[in-house]
Regions:
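Canonical Rossmann dinucleotide-binding motif of NAD(H)/NADP(H)-dependent dehydrogenases/reductases
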Residues: 78-111
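Catalytic loop of short-chain dehydrogenase/reductase
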Residues: 196-303, 309, 314-332
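NAD(P)H-dependent oxidoreductase Rossmann-fold/reductase module
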Residues: 37-64, 138, 269-436
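Glycine-rich phosphate-binding loop and adjoining beta1-alpha1-beta2 segment
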Residues: 105-143
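A glycine-rich helix->loop->beta "capping" turn
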Residues: 159-188
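A short, basic/flexible loop-to-alpha-helix module at the beginning of a structural domain
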Residues: 61-80
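The beta1-alpha1 cofactor-binding region of Rossmann-like NAD(H)/NADP(H)-dependent oxidoreductases
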Residues: 148-160
Length: 436
């Protein structure tokens, strides 16, 4: 999942000199070099489950690592040719875009919502990631354009339709990878706010403050009916259906087109807050939408749509979910010991190379989902998680888990901790048109 639409800690502001409106492409929205302030040293500043700073050079290095991984794995042929990624700036969405572009030479259009840099304040990591990807893709001779804005709105959808029609003709892959705290419904104008809560009864379990390294119990009160409905409205499948209907009605889906959205199921220890909680109910609605979209695409040139259930990873979204960071820290230690650990780019490359393309046929579970969480859910791994879980304390956290690996991956999301980057050097926080 990717925080591709407005976030609670990144509340969008009115248009500034640096952002000429949400409906502008990133190239038009980039700051004027003449307005560039002084260079600055950028350090990570962690506030709870987020980092409020991002390093442009580090983000670019992280993107390049992912590109290098895909290129080293060799071409994915046949693969997608023209791809729309909705939620393209971080996490699984960005990894999907990189895999399509550098694995299959695909033309890509990315939709995202990020905050550009301001006076004395770096941009969000997704802003820097997108610029780095766009620069690398164009240097490789690949088509890469971007639209910055709220993907839930009709205006952004229409702008995407216009750009696809004029530049791409049709798309043969649509990746839907949004995770958001709120959605203004385009028909009713109602603002729905999602929440991460159990349903029915309070939930108590262990969690970890990943910054301080403190393990403690947390109790989360259950959601009420309105909160459940709001979370489904934000994180469910309605917007995915709206995107696909708009593309279909505009005749912008190529015959045989594929669409995929991402989900997570996980082990029983996380079910109360995830699978059986508000977010899980929203994911159930995403699966409902997948079935509807699949039926429509099958009647439109034998296309297909489905959910890919992915591995638990450190992302901007997962770090906000109670209990999950402790589970991920345990999981990382166990899977690294087995040599089966994967990050976002490894997951998406395996999805594309073994399930979607490369002459392969998807393998579905009983629910019609592709499972690239299969290595995570191996019985021996989950048995080991269950054995370790009760014994983890603040005192033995570093011994029992890979909290160091969790922290490293967390900081990399924001461009920190990358090899070869001088974090003691002053850096230009803005990225102007000359950078792409």
């Amino acid at each position: 999942m990717v925080w591709a639409v407005s976030r609670p800690f990144l509340t969008p502001k009115p248009a500034t000199d640096y952002c000429l409106g949400l409906a502008k492409s990133i190239l038009d929205a980039l700051p004027d070099p003449s307005e560039t302030p002084a260079r600055m040293i950028i350090r990570p500043k962690v506030r709870g489950f987020i980092c409020v700073t991002a390093h442009p050079t580090g983000c670019a290095a992280h993107v390049q690592e992912w590109i290098d991984y895909v290129k080293a794995k060799g071409p994915i042929k046949p693969g997608p040719k023209k791809v729309l990624v909705i939620g393209a700036s971080t996490g699984y969405g960005l990894a999907s875009r990189i895999t399509a572009a550098f694995g299959s030479g695909a033309a890509t259009l990315g939709i995202f919502f990020e905050r550009p840099s301001e006076e004395g304040r770096p941009a969000t990591p997704g802003w820097y990631n997108t610029i780095a990807f766009t620069h690398a893709a164009r240097a490789a001779g690949l088509y890469a354009k971007n639209i910055m804005g709220d993907a839930f709105t009709d205006e952004i959808k229409q702008q995407a339709l216009n750009l696809i029609r004029s530049d791409m003709g049709q798309v043969d892959l649509v990746v839907y990878s949004l995770a958001a705290p709120r959605r203004t419904h385009p028909r009713t104008g109602v603002v729905h706010k999602s929440c991460l809560k159990p349903v029915g009864v309070p939930y108590t379990n262990k969690t970890v403050d990943t910054d301080k390294g403190i393990v403690s119990d947390v109790t989360i009160e259950p959601a009420n009916e309105a909160e459940v409905a709001d979370t489904v409205a934000v994180m469910g499948g309605e917007d995915w259906e709206m995107w696909m209907n708009a593309l279909r009605d505009a005749n912008l889906l190529a015959p045989g087109a594929t669409s995929v959205a991402y989900s997570y199921i996980g082990p029983e220890v996380t079910w109360a807050i995830y699978k059986n909680g508000t977010i899980g109910l929203a994911k159930n609605d995403l699966e409902r939408a997948a079935r509807n979209i699949d039926a429509q695409l099958k009647s439109h040139g034998n296309g297909r749509a489905f959910i890919s259930v992915n591995k638990a990873l450190v992302t901007q979204a997962s770090s906000a979910i109670p209990v999950v960071p402790l589970y991920i820290s345990i999981l990382y230690k166990l899977m690294k010991a087995k040599g089966t650990h994967e990050g976002c780019i490894e997951q998406m490359h395996r999805l594309f190379a073994t399930q979607l393309y490369n002459g392969k046929t998807p393998t579905f579970d009983a629910g019609g989902r592709v499972r690239v969480d299969d290595w995570e859910m191996r019985p021996e791994i989950q048995a080991a998680v269950r054995e370790v879980w009760p014994s983890v304390t603040t005192e033995n956290l570093s011994e029992k888990t890979d909290i160091a690996g969790y922290r490293s991956d967390f900081l990399k999301l924001y461009g920190f901790g990358l090899a070869g980057v001088n974090y003691d050097a002053e850096v230009e926080p803005h990225r102007s048109k000359s950078h792409v």
